[in-house]
Amino acid sequence: MPKYRSATTTHGRNMAGARALWRATGMTDADFGKPIIAVVNSFTQFVPGHVHLRDLGKLVAEQIEAAGGVAKEFNTIAVDDGIAMGHGGMLYSLPSRELIADSVEYMVNAHCADAMVCISNCDKITPGMLMASLRLNIPVIFVSGGPMEAGKTKLSEQIIKLDLVDAMIQGADPKVSDSQSDQVERSACPTCGSCSGMFTANSMNCLTEALGLSQPGNGSLLATHADRKQLFLNAGKRIVELTKRYYEQNDESALPRNIASKAAFENAMTLDIAMGGSTNTVLHLLAAAQEAEIDFTMSDIDKLSRKVPQLCKVAPSTQKYHMEDVHRAGGVIGILGELDRAGLLNRDVKNVLGLTLPQTLEQYDVMLTQDDAVKNMFRAGPAGIRTTQAFSQDCRWDSLDDDRANGCIRSLEHAYSKDGGLAVLYGNFAENGCIVKTAGVDDSILKFTGPAKVYESQDDAVEAILGGKVVAGDVVVIRYEGPKGGPGMQEMLYPTSFLKSMGLGKACALITDGRFSGGTSGLSIGHVSPEAASGGSIGLIEDGDLIAIDIPNRGIQLQVSDAELAARREAQEARGDKAWTPKNRERQVSFALRAYASLATSADKGAVRDKSKLGG
């Protein structure tokens, strides 16, 4: 029978000092036999996805206390990728994931907490907390802040939906007037919550449902809607039940590694491919799997990508649908239901509610459930009122979107495409693979060949694009922007957005050892592995080299002879300590980022730390 971890600090005469300090936090004698549950919040006023979380930790804590636990809250950092985008701040985004994971480990282990409720939302916060949860392997429930409502404005006599990416594209488009750009900017992000499309934050919050670590509705129920409050209340009650099941009944099924099994990871990736999620999710799932000591690799993702169709299409891949529309169609469970009926899921998995996949679908799939309360929850919709307050409205759609032929979520028979929304490509400069979000690629450029325009920083590429130096047919290559080479593996949302604003969105390709925002669409291929800074062949590409991209056949090829590549590699190695570094880039790199770079692996490993360098 496992012993409560917290007993280390609450029992025994030699812990008198620790108990004295616990008493100073408000604990009493009656609390010293109860489980201590960490409420891991991420409130900050810097990030719209987190600005409303201040009081939500208290909601969870009250339920923990009422159920017989002791709640202790702390905060992690949270970086807003959109605000950090396009300047040196983006170097810090991915490294913040490791800091978040480590800080959760530090706090939970230092104070011997027994379990956790993780209140996350945006891009690196959910992955960082997920990594920590699987590393620590103590009972956990995730409950995120929820998606932002889509922006809406009137353009050309039509009401259109908007998001952050629209503001960026219009702001860079010389054909758009100042007044229209300002109108879009003011309308794009109307409420608190994670940006309204199927970007990285919402993709990851959806995947926690498929992993079984959050409740149905977590990924899609709007941040502003009153119904979302129930997820927080339920999380506080349920975590105490899970904690007691493990520590008092020796039930290891309550532990996250037994919930988020390899079968669950395969389901999560299947969901991601079907819903056309952000390419960043690949990076984060690979990292989380390593923390869970699960053998889940790019090879597994490649196999799934070849058999899973695209059943959902959401911004940025279309302007018709945002997360509020996914929710109306049944949310994550709605997509999982269609995948299950297609025979594409592992059914022998459970979630934090203790339900098997078939039980979850029977109760929460809008195409199956007889529960009017569940149907009502999925009718929760936007209010269209600017606010930074959680649970501030209770508007509902008149009806559910259960049209699986033409609606937001499709059945297998009516899939958007037989190929899924993500693909892994391999070739002679991506020997370990690279990732493309096929959901955002126009059919006309699924096969593409063009000459390379090579840049050794995102800034140089942006300058060239806006300066008219990139023309239709070019393949823009941005290298030395990987985890080690950046360092920090910057997102390339500005280059892809500016290609669109210059009318080149369907006329050019962009390839990088960096990564892309969840808001990226177009022929944008990232995560090239090995990265240039690790001796990857992307570092050997020269201006004018022809690059052939073949998404249907999962290929990407530099059309240069092996002999020529060998000669270029020899010349690169001859640079000595300057080998595999940019030739003409001046970038100030802080000691914090240098420390990150010294241990970083390439994207095919999830950009996690190289444990071999740490004796692991």
Swiss-Prot record:
Q: Which UniProt keywords apply?
A: 2Fe-2S, Amino-acid biosynthesis, Branched-chain amino acid biosynthesis, Iron, Iron-sulfur, Lyase, Magnesium, Metal-binding
- Residues binding [2Fe-2S] cluster are C122, C195
- Which terms in the Gene Ontology molecular function aspect does this entry carry? 2 iron, 2 sulfur cluster binding; dihydroxy-acid dehydratase activity; magnesium ion binding
- Residues with N6-carboxylysine modification: K124
Cofactor(s) in the UniProt record: [2Fe-2S] cluster; Mg(2+)
The record's section on InterPro entries has: Dihydro-acid_dehy_C, DihydroxyA_deHydtase, DiOHA_6PGluconate_deHydtase_CS, ILV_EDD_C, ILV_EDD_N, IlvD/EDD_N
Q: What is its EC number?
A: 4.2.1.9
Q: Which reaction does it catalyse?
A: (2R)-2,3-dihydroxy-3-methylbutanoate = 3-methyl-2-oxobutanoate + H2O; (2R,3R)-2,3-dihydroxy-3-methylpentanoate = (S)-3-methyl-2-oxopentanoate + H2O
Residues annotated for Mg(2+) binding in this entry: D81, D123, K124, E491
One GO CC term, this protein: cytosol
EC top class named in words: lyase
The record's comment on protein family reads: Belongs to the IlvD/Edd family.
Instruction: Give a short account of what the protein does.
Output: Functions in the biosynthesis of branched-chain amino acids. Catalyzes the dehydration of (2R,3R)-2,3-dihydroxy-3-methylpentanoate (2,3-dihydroxy-3-methylvalerate) into 2-oxo-3-methylpentanoate (2-oxo-3-methylvalerate) and of (2R)-2,3-dihydroxy-3-methylbutanoate (2,3-dihydroxyisovalerate) into 2-oxo-3-methylbutanoate (2-oxoisovalerate), the penultimate precursor to L-isoleucine and L-valine, respectively.
Assembly and binders: Homodimer.
* Protein's name in the database: Dihydroxy-acid dehydratase
Which organism's genome codes for this protein? Shigella sonnei (strain Ss046)
